[in-house]
Amino acid sequence: MTSEAAPASTAVTYKRVMLKISGEALMGDQGYGLHPPTVQRIAREVQAVHRLGVEICMVIGGGNIFRGLQGSAQGMERTTADYMGMLATVMNALAMQAALESLGIFTRVISAIPMDQVCEPYIRRRAVRHLEKKRVCIFAAGTGNPYFTTDTAATLRANEMACQAIFKGTKVDGVYDKDPRKFADARRYETVSYDECLQKHLGVMDASAIALARDNDLPIIVFSLDEPGGFCGILRGEGTYTRVQG
């Protein structure tokens, strides 16, 4: 493993950011579970940003393993289903930690549900100190409470960590007025307001997450995680994306 901090090589727009990705982003074309080459590819995208000197927080969903709402829809008690989903996010966080550390990036998995033999408990001041030491912090187990999504967890942790923006990595290069994979005339927004996202149900994040970002003036940058170098490029003022703001 290499040194914990990487010197900044060029000017960047943000000093500290939250990267939110879905669990499905880790499964590649398999349809379920973890696809190690895909996890490694995403880790390399994070590595490129880390080399710029940016402090990185991450939240990863668990839908590639288990989704609480799905379990609830099939008759499982909602609270139990949500806790199972939270545990799935811990598995994904550990996989990403392993990939990042194989690239020489010191990484901490920090869980909202204590499991001391597996990862650290969430203590805000300790997490901030990790970031200051240029360690990547992956926040797992959502908020630790049922009925809250990992989108809401990402927005909550981004606010607590004083991140300057949330980067939402998706399958498309921004927010569209309709699904660009189904409609050739779909229009991409350069910028869009929090309220318009809520009113038009644009699917950026769930309503609670968008409202929390709006109330704290935290911009959301929606970009394609499949675009090589996309995450790093946006931080250098390049690339295609949508900015959600007030």
UniProtKB/Swiss-Prot annotation:
Its EC number is 2.7.4.22. Allosterically activated by GTP. Inhibited by UTP. It holds the Pfam family AA_kinase. GO terms for molecular function: ATP binding; UMP kinase activity. Residues 28-33 are annotated as: Involved in allosteric activation by GTP. ATP binds at residues 20-23, 63, 67, 170, 176, 179. Coiled coil: none annotated. The keyword ATP-binding applies. GO terms for cellular component: cytoplasm. UMP binds at residues 62, 82, 143-150. It is found in: Cytoplasm. GO terms for biological process: 'de novo' CTP biosynthetic process; UDP biosynthetic process. Homohexamer. Belongs to the UMP kinase family. Catalyzes the reversible phosphorylation of UMP to UDP. This is Uridylate kinase. The gene is pyrH.
